[in-house]
Amino acid sequence: MNTHHHKTFLLHGVTGSGKTQLYLKATAKCISQDKTAIILVPEIILTDQIVRRFVETFGDEVVVFHRKLTVQQRNNNWERLRRKDSHIIIGARSAVFAPAEDIGLIVVDEEHDTSYKQEDMVRYHARNVALWRGEAHGCPVILGSATPSVTSYYKAKQGEYQLLELPHRIFEQPMPKVTIVDMKEEILHGNYSVFSDAMSSLIQKTLNEHNQMIILLNRRGYSTFVMCRDCGETIMCPHCDVAMVYHQAGEELRCHYCEHHEPIPTVCPKCNSQRIKFFGSGTQKVEEELRRHFKSARIARLDQDVTKNKQLAEDILHDFGTHKYDILLGTQMVSKGHDFKDVTAVGILTADSVLNIPVYSASERTFDLLTQTSGRAGRGDKPGSVVIQTYNPLNYAIIKSKAHDYVGFYNEEIQNRKALGYPPFREMIHMVVRHQNMETLEAIANRIVSDLEAHKGNTDILINGPYEASIKKVRDMYRLAIMIRGTDLSNLKEYIYNSWIFTQEGLLIDVDPV
């Protein structure tokens, strides 16, 4: 790998195949030539193991950048880089802007991860910035993942990137055996529990053998909504068009979009009935169920409510790594790059949670989440087992994840994208127009669409909308969406940037939505 020549490598390696070891070797070569390496990871708190491996290997050569550094800590890091006391920068997405001058290598680990896309304030994708900096500095860029983004893999197949593959785990360890459970069948057989019979058996087997297990449920809170059993009224957030979620801690209802919270009502606000019932299961409720059914199990929970406290999250991961817990239960953050040698089992409670979100990449996100989470099992010297619970057992993303078959998934997904005109075959711009008054909102949105139609030219550009956004109100602002697709949107982007549209108050513009 030539640190003086720009080239993009897509490193496709199955979970546990040794991608980090390759990063270490490439970094060693880079700093031996007195150049700087930038290593991007999705989230520092959740990828502490890769940071530790770099620090253990390179010591003081490493500086870590993340958003929670104090100004003084950040300045100290910059000074170390300026004096060339350190040559390795590790950090989450914002580290891609680190003030390094003589860059010889950029690595984007887990390049598929959606957390590389900043969704608020200045919107950018750290992977795209990394590619731009690599080209500007004339250095290689490595994009690594067990589940590469469909767009990156397509570019590799087209010859734009060089594809490197690690198809086997280190020491030829087998991939975990995956069982798919159809939850409709469980209900037909009288099992209404959150745990299928196969899931319960796997949990008990893991505990009996003194191994560890990771359980994924991509919904935090206790119950996902609260409803009156007499009139059917669902308790909604007064500021957002979403159901309030019951959180056991604090005994309150909470909105996950605006953080509004209120006490649990004793009667229905619509009909005054006292027959208020909690529906659905979040991580807090599943934790309670685990403690009730498996009394000897030592259980830790890792979700957004926990990771607000950085030290607590780090302590949980450290303690799980030293086997102080038997089960780690959490949202999708439990799927992120963890390498625990005693984890022999993984349980995925609701494989459909991501599959049903209204975005073109829902199947890709589902395959990524299932494959990455399954890949946490069997990374030591013991074989791994995985149980995936779903109501859609015939969906191709779920079937291909069972076989750890990325190429098979890609081949089916890329055909669907081509037929429907989605990336990588067309560029996309997603707009959300917001206003407190619905009539004013409709007028603004319609004017934007009319203006875009008038300036798109004689091209294949399609403009859909305005239509109701997936969540029609957030923080007292009504929302309408506009979707633009076309093989080349450069002229329309330039027009938007230089027109009144760009300065329209309340408008969110997302280029290349993930």
Pin down the residues of each PLM region:
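Pre-Walker A adenine-sensing motif
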Residues: 1-3
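Inter-lobe coupling/hinge segments of SF2-like helicase ATPases
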Residues: 5-442, 454, 481-482, 490, ...
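Short, flexible, solvent-exposed loop/turn segments with mixed acidic/basic and small polar residues
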Residues: 418-423, 469-475
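Short amphipathic alpha-helices in soluble, non-transmembrane regions
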Residues: 444-450, 492-501
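A carboxyl-terminal module marker
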Residues: 450, 454-456, 461-474
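Conserved short beta-strand edge segments in small beta-sheet-based binding/regulatory domains
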Residues: 458-464, 502-514
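Short Gly/Pro-enriched loop/turn and capping motifs at secondary-structure junctions
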Residues: 470, 489-490
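Short, low-order "capping/linker" segments at domain edges
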Residues: 472-485, 514
